[in-house]
Amino acid sequence: MMLYFFDPVYMMLAVLGYFVMLLLASTIAPKVASRVSGKFSLFTSMVLLAGMILAISAAIIYLILAYAGVYISFYGLIIFLLIINLLMYLLSPYIINLSYGAQRDERLQMVVNSVARRLNVKPPKAVVVRSPPNAFAYGNFLTGKFVAVSESLMRMLSQEELEAVIGHEIGHHKHRDNAVMLLFGLLPSVIFYLGYALLHSSMRDDRRGAQLAAIGIAAVIVSFIVQILVLAFSRLREYYADFEGVRATNKDAMQRSLAKIHLFYHRYPDYLAPIQDSKFRTLFIYAFTNAVAEPITRADIEALKNMKVSPIQEFLSTHPPLPKRLRFIESIRVF
């Protein structure tokens, strides 16, 4: 990646892409979201969004292959990105275990087993980690599945609240979110680097240079649009995991657990930095979007549900903002 730092083409594309993302997140995305909000169920929304991501990605990749011809080793790029991401997928559980000092815990395992039975899934391995209050799910077919909970979070939550958090994390395993988001996360990268390669190719082609450059720039812009859609898809998966937390316990327990974590980081902001800077922050149950309230009582939670959310913060985040999560949990009907 250091080579790209000195590449003016790469830097130009990166700046262009981030400008596109900010424009989408601040103007277009909120308007589109407001129009479709509430019109579809959570599952239908995920299916439609996944279909849109795949359709847009397939269309731009087909366009590049159809018009770029032999200028890009497309399959070589795909294989390279797949290998890199597969290695990260396989090695990340070992890295997480070392980074956070993960240790098996029998008491936590009993809670995980109980919640897993309610959700009709095989219980993952329960580990306690050294970190500020948080929880996350990780693992693969080699290491097995893990649910990690920090010692501080275990002390902070009641038994029922802890079960709600664990239900959320088991939900990620149940929905295969790690693998799903790995695959969807590849698409923006593939499109971006195809566009980047096309722009370089255009400089060496006097006959088709302008055409290749135009397609390359379009591909880069589309890659950031797809990235916005992938982030939206990730937020829907978080809602889906919250649904499992409610199924495992109840709405109030799920809301209280999120509110307690929220309150901790508002009172002790110094603990935010190591979580926000972590390479694994997308795994955490709590993401730090618009964290300013102090929910202690039910009235505090009700007030938090009605807080305004920054569109840019929301649309550039992998997790929904807390007010929207609380409102979603309130709307859940479990049969």
From Swiss-Prot:
Protein encoded by which gene: htpX
Q: Which cofactor does it need?
A: Zn(2+)
A Pfam family matched in the record: Peptidase_M48
Q: Which domain of life is it from?
A: Archaea
EC number(s) per entry: 3.4.24.-
Looking up PANTHER family in the UniProt record yields:
PROTEASE HTPX (PTHR43221), PROTEASE HTPX HOMOLOG (PTHR43221:SF2)
What is the annotated localization of this protein?
Answer: Cell membrane
Q: What is this protein called?
A: Protease HtpX homolog
HAMAP family per record: Pept_M48_protease_HtpX
Which Gene Ontology cellular-component terms appear in the entry? plasma membrane
Active-site residues per Swiss-Prot or TrEMBL entry: 169
What pairs make up the disulfide bonds?
A: none
Transmembrane segments annotated in the record for this chain: 9-29, 42-62, 64-84, 179-199, 213-233
GO molecular-function terms, A-Z: metalloendopeptidase activity; zinc ion binding
Q: Where does Zn(2+) bind?
A: 168, 172, 238
An example of a Gene Ontology BP annotation on this entry? proteolysis
Q: Would you identify the family this protein belongs to, as annotated?
A: Belongs to the peptidase M48B family.
**Topology relative to the membrane:** Multi-pass membrane protein
What organism is this sequence from?
Archaeoglobus fulgidus (strain ATCC 49558 / DSM 4304 / JCM 9628 / NBRC 100126 / VC-16)
What note does UniProt attach to the cofactor annotation? Binds 1 zinc ion per subunit.
Write the record's keywords in alphabetical order, separated by commas.
Answer: Cell membrane, Hydrolase, Membrane, Metal-binding, Metalloprotease, Protease, Transmembrane, Transmembrane helix, Zinc
